Amino acid sequence: MRDIRITGGEPLVRQQVPHLIEMLAGIEKLEDLSLTTNGMLLAEQAQALHDAGLQRLNISLDTLNKEVFEKITRRDGLEKTLQGIDAAIKCGFKSVKLNTLAIKGVTESEVAELVRYALGRNVMLRFIEFMPLDTDRAWQQEQVFTGDQLLQILQNEFESVVPLSRPEPSQPAEEFQVAQGRVGIIRSVTAPFCEACNRIRITADGAVRNCLFATSETPLRGLIRAGASDEDLLSAIRGCLAGKAKAHGIDQDGFQPPDRPMYAIGG
């Protein structure tokens, strides 16, 4: 394990997150430490996170429209999120990226505006195809605004859209040079990258998951509380990884989404 990403839910609601970051940053041979956030609490915490050793930030930004933002998130928080983005940029993190969930009927009209917003701040924007991990379990294949559709809009709106090579096979995003910046497209539904996936997840209640879409998980919390040795824990984790499916199977008949929504898995 070389990289750790803190996700949620929303990790910044946890007390003393900078202290957690500081402890993780002290792990020997750790190469990368990052965090994904909705940005609403970021303005007041960005500097402390940076000083504690956090290297990279991914910030969710699905829209720049106040009313649409409230409909998606069920709260009035767009201004706080935008303030959080600007605060993060000023802190000088190694990387700040914006993640936009691409939903048909929502994203089409804002693709160009979102890209220009990111380009104007010299940060990378990544569009992510809508996955069946929503809280309301209302996902339908027809709602997926596909990578091909996104790329078509980019090509219509910008003079030059040039594909870039992936620096690592396990990187989920296809990257494109757009104007003076980069835009990513993560085709998690229409062109999944399961063969190159090198990630595991630990949930907030101490369970290991070998895939975002896994329907089973391996609990570690009970083992730890019972006094399990490091070797016992390692054996449990290896057993979990050995059961990893070849692919998530979203496009297969009979696909069953996981019992947990995204916020309860960590994504």
Model-found features: residue ranges?
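Auxiliary Fe-S-binding modules of radical SAM enzymes
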Residues: 116-120, 130-267
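Radical SAM/AdoMet-radical enzyme domain recognition
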Residues: 1-6, 10, 14-126
